[in-house]
Amino acid sequence: MTIETFSWGIKVSSQPTEGSKDTVRKIQFGDGYAQVSGSGLNDEIRTYEFSFSGDPITANEIHAFLRRHKVKSFIFTPPFGDTALWRVEADTLKKVVKNVKVITVTATFEQAFAP
């Protein structure tokens, strides 16, 4: 199985946002002490808010690519970030037709740890 690569350029002017979701276990004791630990090997999942506005041909190519990757990983390198496996987070893919020359595609990518 070949893992596809997201090869479209990301415009930094669109102010892309990278975040993270942490999976931690916390036990609070009566004396105020708290014990905190990561939950599993991958206790931090990075997220990336993606947005593209542009010509309909490119927008539709991106939308089709992202539709294929809701449950299947792809390779992506965020601006100023590290190359990793990602997939489209459930229920976040959207396509808005602004006019005949501009379509906007948005989605949230979440880090994947296996294809």
Swiss-Prot record:
InterPro entries: Phage_lambda_TipM. The keyword tRNA processing does not apply. It comes from the Viruses. It is found in: Virion; Host cytoplasm. Its main location: virion. One of its GO terms (biological process) is symbiont genome ejection through host cell envelope, long flexible tail mechanism. Pfam families: Phage_min_tail (PF05939). Keywords: Host cytoplasm, Late protein, Viral genome ejection through host cell envelope, Viral long flexible tail ejection system, Viral penetration into host cytoplasm, Viral tail protein, Virion, Virus entry into host cell. One of its GO terms (cellular component) is host cell cytoplasm. Belongs to the lambda-like tail tip protein M family. Part of the distal tail tip which plays a role in DNA ejection during entry, and in tail assembly initiation during exit. May bind tail tip complex associated with tape measure protein and allow tail tube protein polymerization on top of tail tip. This is Tail tip protein M. The lineage of its organism: Viruses, Duplodnaviria, Heunggongvirae, Uroviricota, Caudoviricetes.
